[in-house]
């Protein structure tokens, strides 16, 4: 092998190695910033179609309704714990160490984003509450729609509002 071919081969190997390194770093960065949406039932039992459970330490988003009577506040700090449930019966505990949104209430729909710290417990970094009685985050509405039966109202019920 002459010097010219050796130089080209070295350049080609270095170029392929550089592209592979950049691609792997890019995939790693995208994977670490990926937040998958789960319902409380999916966290406990796994995704319905695949049965895949989220891993401890994984960043996820959880949507559901705040269980009435489950909120516990620490009087000396901003720490709060509450349970989130869905219609299928799944329930997880959420801990949060910041100010809750003004519209946060028990019995309301929320989306909490954070890290799963143990089975059925989420350390939230962000809590989003719906902004009026008719709004529900799209992910929660879709997940709840899959597990809730649609209500049929008669004409009297529709006009009583």
Curated annotation (Swiss-Prot):
This is Cytochrome c-type biogenesis protein CcmE. GO terms for biological process: cytochrome complex assembly. HAMAP family: CcmE. Belongs to the CcmE/CycJ family. Heme binds at residues 131, 135. Residues 1-8 are cytoplasmic. Gene3D superfamilies: Nucleic acid-binding proteins (2.40.50.140). It comes from Shewanella sediminis (strain HAW-EB3). The chain crosses the membrane at residues 9-29. Residues 30-161 are periplasmic. GO terms for cellular component: plasma membrane. It is a single-pass type II membrane protein.
